[in-house]
Amino acid sequence: MAGHSQFKNIMHKKGKQDAIRSKLFSKLAREITVAAKLGLPDPNMNARLRAAVIAARVENMPKDNIERAIKKASGADAENYDEVRYEGYGPGGVAVIVEALTDNRNRTAGEIRSYFTKVGGALAETGAVSFMFDHIGRIEFPAKVGSEEAMLEAAIEAGAEDVLSGEEGHEVLTSLEMLRDVALALEAKFGEPTRASLIWKPQNTISLDDETGEKVLRLIGLLEDNDDVQNVYANYEVSEAVLAKLEA
């Protein structure tokens, strides 16, 4: 298991669930509001908003919170958020991409830069590391919706590029352009996905020693904890020993 997914598993196993959930709801609400403001306020007519609402439902975000976030987009006092991508190098030369929604670019850039500096990394220019990743679509379904063979057949027929199936579920990968069409086709067959989004998938990963691995995970923890940061992607792998230490 590589990079970001390792860190996510650690966070879910730690005992700070209430604080994590509160911060998560805030980030989900921000994405819903931005998506609704950029397009129509109807999830059925706005692919990005639909994906944001699905992500919120998966995390058991209350329906009232979701509706309030959508309505906020059309309010006179609606905040304006800029979509910003930061790129940099973490310990061990790990490439890191950070996606944020911010109402103050200078504040967010300063905070992101400080996190990289704390662990001996460096914030770089946009484009410095993104060439090491593929910007693609990813659709996720629980394992129970169908067999690996059924998902693979349906996904390829719908125009997907790859399918990864396992005990945790099915992960369907698509081109940027085909994400919406494939998601709709698979939803018609298997029901609503648990997530449908654009991601940065590393082309290759770096295996880190334990000390460097801990520093990289610390960096990702700092980034994830920032209110403006929506997603973090990195091209690393760490040992089970490091994961066990952090989960303790």
UniProtKB/Swiss-Prot annotation:
Organism domain of life: Bacteria
GO terms of biological process kind: regulation of DNA-templated transcription
A Pfam family the protein falls into: TACO1_YebC_N
Source organism of this protein record: Methylocella silvestris (strain DSM 15510 / CIP 108128 / LMG 27833 / NCIMB 13906 / BL2)
Family statement: Belongs to the TACO1 family.
Keyword Aminoacyl-tRNA synthetase tagged: no
UniProt xrefs under NCBIfam families: PRK00110.1, PRK12378.1, YebC/PmpR family DNA-binding transcriptional regulator
Matches recorded under InterPro entries: Integrase-like_N (IPR017856), TACO1_YebC-like_2nd/3rd_dom (IPR048300), TACO1_YebC_N (IPR049083), Transcrip_reg_TACO1-like (IPR002876), Transcrip_reg_TACO1-like_dom3 (IPR026564), YebC-like (IPR029072)
Protein's name in the database: Probable transcriptional regulatory protein Msil_2305
Classification of source organism: Bacteria, Pseudomonadati, Pseudomonadota, Alphaproteobacteria, Hyphomicrobiales
HAMAP family: Transcrip_reg_TACO1
Cellular compartments annotated: Cytoplasm
GO molecular function: DNA binding
Gene3D superfamilies linked to this entry: 1.10.10.200, 3.30.70.980
Keywords: Cytoplasm, DNA-binding, Transcription, Transcription regulation
